[in-house]
Amino acid sequence: MSSTKDIDALIDLMAKLPGLGPRSARRTVLHLIRKRSLLLIPLADTLQTVAETARECLNCGNVGTTDVCDICTCEKRANGELCVVEDVADLWAMERSGIFKGRYHVLGGTLSALDAVGPQELRIPRLLDRVPSEGITEVILALNATIDGQTTAHYIADNLEGQVRLTSLAQGVPIGGELDYLDDGTITAAMRARKSF
């Protein structure tokens, strides 16, 4: 039996994280071990806490530690504006920019014929219910400028046409770009220059 079995298992798990390959995972784990009391133990404790408390907001799909997130419960938010994003990382990117003061709806992905992802596999039915029930006046389609993102935007627009003002992000978002990788200034410029969809 290997004396590094548990360490190897940790390296294998770390290598499954986005942006970390086997070599990066190995270096990260070795660094954590060297900084046991400063990093490893607090990280393990925090991971355990997050594993027990993290959940998706029942209303919008954001991630937090309560059933309904702080954004959905904030009375200072503009109730009539709903920004639709693909995933939580996109929501967090929009929040970092500080430009949007409305509410969000996280789809949980995009429509994809290749991956057999239809509207029912995403939070699209919930979105279509939220618009009339919450008195939404504008839906901002802040989806990534990919083929699947634009296909999803068109599907949503077709289903909401005539019910609400539909806009999408404009300048600043490159074709093929993803919101999570954009700087705050680019997101701000794109949000300010949104246009009818």
Swiss-Prot record:
Name the Gene3D superfamilies for this protein.
3.40.1360.10, RecR Domain 1
Q: Which InterPro entries match?
A: DNA_Rcmb_RecR (IPR000093), Rcmb_RecR (IPR023627), TOPRIM_dom (IPR006171), TOPRIM_RecR (IPR034137)
Q: Mark the C4-type zinc finger spans by residue number.
A: 57-72
Q: Which UniProt keywords apply?
A: DNA damage, DNA recombination, DNA repair, Metal-binding, Zinc, Zinc-finger
Q: What SUPFAM superfamilies does UniProt report for this protein, alphabetically?
A: Recombination protein RecR
- A Pfam family cross-referenced in the UniProt record is RecR_C
Claim: Transferase is one of the keywords in the record: no
Query: Quick one: a GO biological-process term for this protein?
Result: DNA recombination
Toprim domain ranges (all copies): 80-174
Which molecular function term from Gene Ontology is one that the record holds?
zinc ion binding
The task this protein performs is described as: May play a role in DNA repair. It seems to be involved in an RecBC-independent recombinational process of DNA repair. It may act with RecF and RecO.
HAMAP family, alphabetized: RecR
The similarity annotation says: Belongs to the RecR family.
Family annotation (NCBIfam families): recR (TIGR00615)
Q: What is the protein name given in its UniProt record?
A: Recombination protein RecR
Source organism per UniProt: Roseobacter denitrificans (strain ATCC 33942 / OCh 114) (Erythrobacter sp. (strain OCh 114))
